Amino acid sequence: MALAVSGLHHVTIRVQDPDRARAFYEETLGLPFIEIPVDQAFVREWKGNPSEGTLLATQIGSTFLILAPPLEGTPDDDRFSERRIGVDHLAFGVDDPAVLEEVTAALEEASVPTAGIETDPVLGKPYVAFRDPDNVQWEFFLAS
């Protein structure tokens, strides 16, 4: 059965320190976030998260990126690892190669480690990879 999926609606990432994560995404990548209070009914019941605070949301194309505080019981020093089953990395698609240069410059200015613009060995497309403050690997990938 083929599903009529129109795209990826949202990605939610649990972050250790929402303020630190927000600063990284807003100041380094220029992604503006809005705050969604956790005490709203639909959020209170969401995934059984009893914590107070806010969810942070931004829209990238037609996809929403949501940053959520850690669930109760998450170790204070927990960080993302692609060596566990689950997500390996996430990639933003861009249509203009100049965006890759802009992202690389912004990452370097913010002292975020990156190998610069590389070429994907399978697709032959340029991309730039980096890690956020919670160690999640992100890529900006030339989609066209």
Locate each region found by the language model.
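Core segments of cupin and vicinal oxygen chelate
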Residues: 14-64
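Short, charged/polar, Gly/Pro-enriched secondary-structure boundary elements
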Residues: 65, 75-76, 134-137
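A short, acidic/glycine-rich surface segment
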Residues: 41-45, 72-78, 116
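Acetyl-CoA-dependent GNAT
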Residues: 68-75, 143-144
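A generic structural micro-feature
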Residues: 3, 48-52, 81-84
